[in-house]
Amino acid sequence: MGSIKGRFAVFANFDYRAGAPPAVSFGNRGGCPTIKQRAQSFVSEFQFGGEFVWWPSPELIAKSNLQQFINKHGLGSYDELMTRSTTDIAWFWNSVLQDLDIQFHKPYSRVVDLSKGKPWAKWCADGQMNIVHNMLDKYAGTPTDNNPAIKSETENGTVSLLTYKELREQVDRMANSLRSLGLGKGHAIGVFMPMVPEIVVAMLAIIKIGAIFLPLFSGFGAAAIASRLNDADAKALFTAAGTYRRGKFCAMKLIADEAAAQIPTLQHVVVLNQASEWLIEDLRRDAKPPATLSGPFDDSPTERTSAEDPMMIIYTSGTTGRPKGAVHTHCGFPIKSAQDMWQGLDLHADETLFWMTDMGWMMGPWEVFGTLLLGATMMLYDGAPDFPEPDRVWSLVDRHKVTALGVSPTLIRALRRYGDEIVHRHDLSSLRKFASTGEPWNPEPWTWLFQNVGRGKLPIINYSGGTEISGGILMGNVLTPMKPCAFSGPLPGMAADVVDENGNSVRGQVGELVIREPWIGMTRGFWKDPDRYIQTYWSRFPDVWVHGDWAAVDNDGLWYILGRSDDTIKVAGKRVGPAEVESVLVAHSQVSEAAAVGIPDPIKGEALVCFCVLKKDVNGDPSLATELKASVARDLGKALAPKEIIFVGDIPKTRNAKVMRRIVRAAYLGEKLGDTSALENPASLDDIKRAAG
């Protein structure tokens, strides 16, 4: 398949209700979005058809899970699969459930029930199924039982391994203990722990007894924990004595205790102490002192639950008001996770997946559900990715023979500054693929990962979706050739589209990313807040999910995400997405990371202020700032030249490496920061505040 060099002149001053899209160009930067100004009318020339840089081999295609699914179901091509999977959703998701060997206590009577409308689709109607049965119980007595389920390493170098059998035994014991405390079906139980094997034990024990798992970001403060657990009327909380970050002990139990005092419904705290022993604290009046976990080692029966019983609530960060709790069921999030891993990432049972994440973000539960449903191995790491040496990630891949490495663009930008030598000192031959999520790519770090780490041989499977999606809307795969920064397209079963302000499909221009049909992983709504769910996703076009991302499709059918539609900056009437500005900045040889925000300007309406992290041993000075301003003006047009370039030591990010532009802007303007509970590196705000004076 060759590249197509078609060009389309498109005016950029659309009037979208949620703000007009940024103007972009594909092709000159290897398929990644950039912006060009065309004379005074600000016409953007869309150049589609960047060069393909990776092609799958015939052997890889033949062995791939996706091709085998196509063959098994008598489909003539990938395109035929995409058409049928989005027009006959009952057939597709029934096929996925069967091919993944999802076992039900009671079979479902219908795959999907749309009687209450698309926003309230119900799946596996009348079926009974507890997902833990399919993750652990069904492997008992099979060869999978002796395979590794979890490999793990902590920052101090402690390494451990649990087989499927060992994990099941630990989950059974914990489930027995929880039942002895009176906990069971429908009770909400929070988990505030580091990424160690015990967090998986806690998660699966909660789900096994029919309770509701509430994952919490390990960097939360007491107020953030309390607000979420109060919203869910939580009965219990798992926590740990603490964890280490960059060699420093971070106490978690003290934070949990402070939160527990603010949660009237909380009755028990289950603590993993520094000796890796479980202690149970009873918070009720006249309770006994903490006791060690005393559940019997006997098998624990898995609770028979409805396939649509709530199984997990993941709270997404907001700026005001009560937190949004996305509700997920036994037949929802786990199935979507496994499908994405199986058909998109092409993960096989003999593989080890390592994704740098936290259980408080959707990629944590996603990794657990997907790997165990596929009979594969997850790799957990609790620690900083560049401590005690900047090669920590590459050493983990080497030591644990990781085959699929999940990263974020921010992580790669940070690691790239240390150079190539630290990568090449390790044996990375076990790697078969990369995967990436969290934010749009810039071309330079994508190319560095592809060429310098993957040596131009390994695909980078781009992945974009969200917590309420249960995984991906768009994803790469191993059937289609790849361009830098692009997606192969929507995942099978995801009826995604790019639309204009009237909801009409568009190609050759930027539009809103939408989904036209329900899918099995779709959140069942926000906990105790159905109106907010409808307003957030379903209120703009009838029966259409509007995701809040700018997207585009090129002439070769590859898709691109250009950032959040509510991040758009408008300078003197000209609209630009922060990712486009940041791509120009990180293309400079001395810049590692960048964040662009718009601030009020009395003349232009908004002005660009850009924050840059420089590479190692580079000192920022006025001449470099001037050079960077000139680069943006040259690439994007003089009207979009930044008002200021500010050099900082770090940029505020979440644990899953999303840049928190809202907080960057608020800190610079001296405004209230709002919800900062998801912030991984609060010290990064100091440089921004100092720059603001």
State the predicted function of each range.
Residues 216-242, 398, 405, 517-519, ...:
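AMP-binding/adenylate-forming catalytic core of the ANL superfamily
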